[in-house]
Amino acid sequence: MAISWKEMNELQPRVMKLLYNSIEKDRLSHAYLFEGKKGTGKLDAALLLAKSFFCLEGGAEPCESCRNCKRIESGNHPDLHLVQPDGLSIKKAQIQALQEEFSKTGLESHKKLYIISHADQMTANAANSLLKFLEEPNKDTMAVLITEQPQRLLDTIISRCQTLPFQPLQPKAIEDRLIEQDVSPHMARLLANMTNNVAEAVELSRNDEFAESRAKVIKLYEVLHQRKGHAFFFIQDQWMPFFKEKTHQEMGLDMLLLIYRDVLSIQIGNEDKLIYQDLFQSIKQHALQSTQQSVTNQILAVLEAKKRLHSNVNVQGLMEHLVLMLQEG
């Protein structure tokens, strides 16, 4: 089931309050621009707005049970149109087809709504066609444009829309959403600190490889600080065969970075912010036996390794150098 109005309100309170008040006062704009980073709920909010727009109950929040709400939920409402890139771009023909469709009377009512996802990917011709469409708004037609890169849109298109900025999601909000979906608390907290995209976090939580990656990272940390002589063997025999791709290596380094951040959090008295709460005892011991400067150096070493990972380097050599830096502190 799609996200509810209440859930969306918790993720993007400013946006949802503005939409709620506009619906209540019957002052909805004819065109909105939802802009923000990937995973901030722009499409979910657009579909919730569509439900409110078409809902037979007529409230500010959709009832979720009438025929129109259910048809939008299943993606088959005849007067709601979703335009997405065809390949790498949204083409002029797609906008022209939309205009032709909207020149007809609504099949279910006098209302029509269209959503253009990744609006920044419109070709120049498509954007110009849309501009003409926006210049002659119909009072019963609403447009919602969605983008992660508003700077790529024509200024004339932006000026004809009410822009609603979607803020990056706070880790706590993502963590709560994941726990609601039966993700374990320790995994939810880690995921919430690795991505601000709820959908991506949910997908990763269901990926066995992510859990295995976490276990490998914890093992490396333990070897680094409890069995120092085995660290190079671990890199060769377990780390490298498992983290084969650079993107996977980067994820492993991100996880490792968060462990050292936890150590620093304990040192400065922020124990409530720990991500690896199940490692509390070993992390606390590390914190007590180290200076803040040495832990800061370890954090900087991981960040430098991440940076060098994207250049043409031997990854095993990079990891072995990182081991030396982490053990030196």
Swiss-Prot record:
Keyword Cytoplasm found: yes
Gene Ontology cellular component annotations, sorted alphabetically: cytoplasm; DNA polymerase III complex; nucleoid
Native organism taxonomy: Bacteria, Bacillati, Bacillota, Bacilli, Bacillales
Name of this protein: DNA polymerase III subunit delta'
Catalysed reaction, written as an equation: DNA(n) + a 2'-deoxyribonucleoside 5'-triphosphate = DNA(n+1) + diphosphate
UniProt keyword Transferase present: yes
NCBIfam families documented for this protein: holB, PRK08058.1
EC number(s) per entry: 2.7.7.7
Assembly: Component of the DNA clamp loading complex consisting of tau(3):delta(1):delta'(1). The DNA polymerase III holoenzyme complex contains at least 10 different subunits organized into 3 functionally essential subassemblies: the Pol III core, the beta sliding clamp processivity factor and the clamp-loading complex. The Pol III core (subunits alpha, epsilon and theta) contains the polymerase and the 3'-5' exonuclease proofreading activities. The polymerase is tethered to the template via the dimeric beta sliding clamp processivity factor.
Single GO term (MF): DNA binding
SUPFAM superfamilies: P-loop containing nucleoside triphosphate hydrolases
Location within or outside the cell: Cytoplasm, Nucleoid
GO terms of biological process kind: DNA-templated DNA replication
Pfam families: DNA_pol3_delta2, DNApol3-delta_C
Alphabetic keyword roster: Cytoplasm, DNA replication, DNA-directed DNA polymerase, Nucleotidyltransferase, Transferase
Function: DNA polymerase III is a complex, multichain enzyme responsible for most of the replicative synthesis in bacteria.
